[in-house]
Design a protein with these regions (language model features):
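Preference for intrinsically disordered or flexible, low-complexity segments
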Residues: 1-205
Length: 205
């Protein structure tokens, strides 16, 4: 299974209802937003369709990724998931199939002082890559997993998104000694576009 590599670039234009990494999510009006999780990215599925050679992913609509990763930005007073495989409350993936015929709004996250907390949004550029591609990606094999498959009951689950540790202009994301966060989904759930039951696991060498 090939990977879809995700390269990040400085955003030169407004990325409203476009694929973007960090920033604030653009969601349908009155969407139930998990404000206790960090927004990672939103991905327009029509931008990844040509690289999804096995037709595993949706090819229209938008995918949204949220996770309890504030701790890994160095905010050590924040909640940190303790299980090897995270509970569903700690990782959320949402799929909105129709992005053409409804009204969207940007949800801005703020702290107790009403200061915006989102990281600077970045443009996402997609390309085809080999299965073991490192960095940020979708699909393929986990780059730094040191065993053959995920443990039961997650054996055979698909890598929906791999999030790499990195130094950004305004912060550092470090998953336990420069590891990676792997967001996983059951293959049948992915086929049925059901993203309600996902998990994630941090691997670090």
């Amino acid at each position: 299974m090939d990977s879809i590599k995700i390269s990040l670039e400085k955003a030169e234009n407004d990325l409203f209802i476009q694929s973007k990494w960090w920033g604030n999510p653009d969601l349908p009006e009155k969407f139930d937003v998990p404000d206790d999780l960090t927004f990672i990215c939103q991905i327009r599925c029509d931008e990844i369709a040509e690289y999804d050679v096995e037709n595993l992913l949706p090819h229209k609509g938008m995918l949204y990724f949220f996770a309890a990763i504030d701790y890994y930005f160095g905010n050590f007073d924040s909640y940190c998931p303790s299980n090897l495989y995270w509970d569903n409350d700690d990782i959320k993936v949402f799929y909105v199939e129709d992005i053409e015929n409804q009204t969207f709004e940007q949800v801005v996250f703020v702290d107790d002082d009403c200061k915006e907390v989102a990281l600077k949004e970045m443009k996402m550029v997609f390309s085809k890559a080999d299965s073991m591609c490192d960095g940020n990606k979708m699909l393929g094999e986990p780059y730094n997993r040191e065993w053959d498959d995920w443990d039961e009951p997650y054996k055979g689950w698909v890598e929906l998104l791999q999030v790499d540790s990195d130094d950004y202009d305004d912060c550092t994301l470090n998953f336990i000694d420069w590891g990676m966060l792997h967001i996983l989904i059951n293959r049948n759930d992915l086929k049925n576009k059901d993203f309600s039951n996902v998990t994630s696991c941090i691997c670090s060498t």
